[in-house]
Amino acid sequence: MFSVDGDNVIITGGSRGIGLALAEGFSSAGANVITLDINPPEVEGNYNYINCDLGNQDHIQVVLDRIFSDGFIPKVLINCAAVTIPAPSHQYPDTDWRKSISVNLDAVFTLCREVGRIMINSSISGSIINFTSIGVEQGFANNPGYAATKGAVKQLTKALAVEWGEHGIRVNNIVPGYTNTPMNSKSWNNPLLRKQRSDRTVFGRWAEPEEMVGPAIFLASDASSYVTGVDLVVDGGWLVKGM
């Protein structure tokens, strides 16, 4: 039921952090994994890496066309890649805003559209998993590009889940809390910020990237055959904790 053995899987942002953990986890579970990222993986594994500039929609299209023409038809797409560029909103540069939209939203839609199309045309009942953030459930200051794009992805997921359900395609979000990844290294390396974020959870600690693998395999596999359009929160109790 929880098997992804033999499934073709595309993962963006698979060079480090959560994306790398997903690439290693799915390949260890027997999936055929292709990772897309602008940089090669920090750790070599039993998966294929393809250079892809996720801020360039034309390049994404070229890469996907090559993957599909080689006969790799995905059953699972995981959009994990993202950029975070913090700055006060009243001083936020247009270049950072556009980069956030390009990588965090445009790339997600392009990948969903192209993979969704080939799933539909190939009659594949597949699974698309988009990573959002606890920042779409609460207000986080000084990062408008990240907040806006992740919020948009949340709603895109729900729209696609409704539209593509008739084709047997499930589309869901994973909502991670603070995770020990290179993206969060500034907060992780600051003892005060690390403790503040740890204390906000029920477990008193951050997540490790590997803790996102199980939820992703659940959503990718037949174990979630009747689950679509949901936000699967993996935050150590951040959102539910009160006083």
Please give the residue ranges for each predicted region.
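Residue(s) in the substrate-gating loop at a strand-loop-helix junction
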Residues: S133
